[in-house]
């Protein structure tokens, strides 16, 4: 495997931040655009804003929700600066606001709520949305297929590729197509998609698939050298947060994956082929964290599209832990996505 392909799955390197001050950070590397896009990947902004804020809260505080807005398209040719503002420090909750800048202009903002970790004995009322039979489940090979091979069969097959090429010029570019394959095969996320993922003829209100993160991330709280310090000084601010030393990096990784193949799935609910949009931009992104997301395990995702109107589309996702069957996170995103008429798309495809 080439160095460039290995770098595609190096999440720590992709998201790495350099401190400018205790509350300001700059990206170490340029923020990449996803395949087929000109702007910075939204998941990079969401996850880096969370990572920046984690550098300013004590070890025993965990994120419970994140509300963010994409204000201006990110420039992949310029590093991003993040400023973390402390809104409130309480005994049980901490509120942070993170602002991202390029060229001295605000491009993204997020508000993040952290809650102190409580003892299990404290919990009184409990309820978890659970999917029966999901516990310990692996993707059914009769219904799901690894994304790389599915893309090659359902999109890159010469006969089918010509149909996609009629919708967009990028499908006439062999280099661009190889980038899609590389992203599926070597990228941060590994997917198991339903076999009709790229073009579904059935009418449905729900899309489900499996996803996990390839690079290993610890689930042991404060697994690095700071573990003993955490035991005696839980309110200590960490010196560093990496996939190896802090289980809270799972939240960062989840924030990254939560913006991938979410808004892009809108055509699935309208019996249109994926990638048939002419313009797409995310407007906002909200995450509710219900538990520590173990991102190296398969995560089962159920997506719905409650509303599409006047080029504004709302998608919602429920993410379930396949080890327990319990819901681990809920995500909502609205985007401004422009499509041609359904009749024209179907006629071309």
Swiss-Prot record:
Motif Microbody targeting signal in this chain: 347-349
Pfam families: 4HBT_3 (PF13622), Acyl_CoA_thio (PF02551)
Main localization, broad class: other
GO BP annotations listed: acyl-CoA metabolic process; fatty acid beta-oxidation; fatty acid catabolic process; fatty acid oxidation
Listed GO MF terms: carboxylic ester hydrolase activity; fatty acyl-CoA hydrolase activity
Catalytic activity: hexadecanoyl-CoA + H2O = hexadecanoate + CoA + H(+)
Coiled coil: none
Domain of life of the organism encoding this protein: Eukaryota
SUPFAM superfamilies, alphabetized: Thioesterase/thiol ester dehydrase-isomerase
Keywords from the UniProt entry: Hydrolase, Peroxisome, Serine esterase
Active-site residues, Swiss-Prot/TrEMBL: 259 (charge relay system), 282 (charge relay system), 333 (charge relay system)
Induction: Up-regulated by oleic acid.
Known EC number: 3.1.2.2
Family annotation (CDD domains): Thioesterase_II_repeat1 (cd03444), Thioesterase_II_repeat2 (cd03445)
Annotated GO CC locations: mitochondrion; peroxisomal matrix; peroxisome
Intracellular or extracellular location(s): Peroxisome
Family: Belongs to the C/M/P thioester hydrolase family.
Function field: Acyl-coenzyme A (acyl-CoA) thioesterases are a group of enzymes that catalyze the hydrolysis of acyl-CoAs to the free fatty acid and coenzyme A (CoASH), providing the potential to regulate intracellular levels of acyl-CoAs, free fatty acids and CoASH. Contributes to growth on fatty acids.
The protein's name in its UniProt record: Peroxisomal acyl-coenzyme A thioester hydrolase 1
């Amino acid at each position: 495997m080439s160095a460039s392909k290995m770098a595609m799955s190096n999440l720590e390197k992709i998201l790495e931040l350099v401190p400018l001050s205790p509350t300001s950070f700059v990206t170490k590397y340029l923020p990449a655009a996803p395949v087929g896009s000109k702007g910075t990947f939204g998941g990079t902004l969401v996850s880096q804003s969370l990572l920046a804020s984690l550098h300013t809260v004590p070890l025993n505080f965990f994120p419970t929700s994140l509300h963010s807005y994409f204000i201006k398209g990110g420039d992949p040719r310029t590093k991003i600066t993040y400023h973390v503002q402390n809104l409130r420090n309480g005994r049980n909750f901490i509120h942070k606001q993170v602002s991202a800048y390029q060229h001295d202009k605000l491009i993204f903002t997020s508000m993040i709520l952290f809650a102190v970790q409580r003892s299990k004995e404290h919990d009184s009322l409990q309820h978890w949305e659970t999917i029966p039979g999901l516990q310990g489940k692996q993707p059914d090979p009769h219904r799901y297929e690894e994304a790389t091979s599915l893309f090659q069969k359902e999109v890159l097959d010469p006969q089918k590729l010509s149909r996609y090429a009629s919708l967009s010029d990028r499908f006439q570019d062999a280099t661009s197509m190889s980038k899609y394959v590389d992203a599926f095969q070597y990228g941060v996320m590994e997917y198991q998609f339903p076999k009709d993922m790229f073009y579904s003829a059935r009418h449905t209100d729900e899309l489900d698939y499996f996803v996990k993160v390839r690079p290993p991330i610890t689930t042991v709280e404060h697994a690095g050298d700071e573990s003993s310090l955490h035991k005696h000084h839980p309110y200590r601010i960490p010196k560093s947060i990496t996939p190896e030393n802090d289980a809270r990096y799972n939240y960062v990784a989840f924030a990254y994956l939560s913006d991938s193949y979410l808004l892009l799935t809108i055509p699935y609910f309208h019996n249109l082929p994926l990638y048939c949009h002419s313009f797409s931009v995310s407007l906002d992104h909200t995450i509710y964290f219900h538990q520590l997301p173990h991102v190296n395990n398969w995560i089962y995702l159920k997506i719905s599209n409650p509303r599409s109107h006047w080029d504004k589309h709302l998608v919602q996702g429920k993410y379930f832990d396949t080890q327990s069957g319990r819901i681990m996170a809920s995500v909502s995103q609205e985007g401004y996505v422009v499509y041609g008429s359904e009749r024209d798309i179907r006629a071309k495809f």
